[in-house]
């Protein structure tokens, strides 16, 4: 039986995306820093930086999907506090960026091979990286949206402490 949660689909604008039920990723915060992963050369948009994430399964919530993908790609999952979910709606397809705070130390391990590397970085460093096109397009809005989230007061629109 075919897995209905996999494959490319087109949104209302004709853009191609992975996952007919949408996708979700986890933007993990540790104090002022966030965790990014460099995608393996073997995956779509390889060798770019993004957050762990992927296609949602049928009926799966963005929170559950983001945590599942994070654990698969980075070999584990810390205890989390959900802060917010940003939705990038493309019309017929959406990407959900789940923002969460790590409530315990977390050290990524080798996961399913989709991540070639990972790093903690300040929000100000993000724009200087070679980003996944979808993440690059939403990063300015995400960075601005981080300002004022519970526990993150004092970040300016670029995600820097003011």
Range-by-range predicted roles:
Residues 1-25:
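Acidic, metal-coordinating catalytic segment for phosphate/diphosphate chemistry
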Residues 29-30, 89:
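Generic beta-strand structural signal
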Residues 30-72:
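Conserved Nudix-box catalytic region and its N-terminal flanking loop in Nudix hydrolases
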Residues 76-86:
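A short coil-to-beta-strand element that immediately follows conserved catalytic motifs
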Residues 84-113, 117-125, 138-142:
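Active-site-adjacent beta-strand/loop module that shapes the phosphate/pyrophosphate-binding cleft
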Residues 145-160:
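Compositionally biased, intrinsically disordered low-complexity segments enriched
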């Amino acid at each position: 039986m075919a897995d209905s949660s996999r494959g490319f689909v087109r949104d209302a604008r004709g853009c191609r995306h992975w996952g007919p039920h949408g996708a979700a990723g986890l933007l993990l915060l540790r104090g002022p820093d966030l965790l990014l992963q460099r995608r393996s050369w073997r995956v779509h948009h390889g060798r770019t930086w993004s957050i762990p994430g992927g296609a949602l399964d049928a009926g799966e919530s963005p929170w559950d999907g983001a945590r599942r993908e994070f654990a698969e790609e980075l070999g584990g999952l810390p205890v989390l506090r959900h802060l917010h979910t940003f939705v990038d709606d493309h019309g017929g397809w959406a990407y959900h960026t789940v923002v969460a705070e790590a409530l315990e130390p977390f050290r990524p391990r080798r996961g399913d091979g989709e991540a070639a590397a990972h790093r903690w970085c300040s929000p100000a460093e993000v724009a200087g990286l070679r980003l996944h096109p979808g993440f690059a397009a939403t990063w300015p809005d995400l960075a601005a949206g981080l300002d004022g989230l519970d526990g993150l007061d004092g970040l300016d629109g670029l995600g820097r402490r003011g």
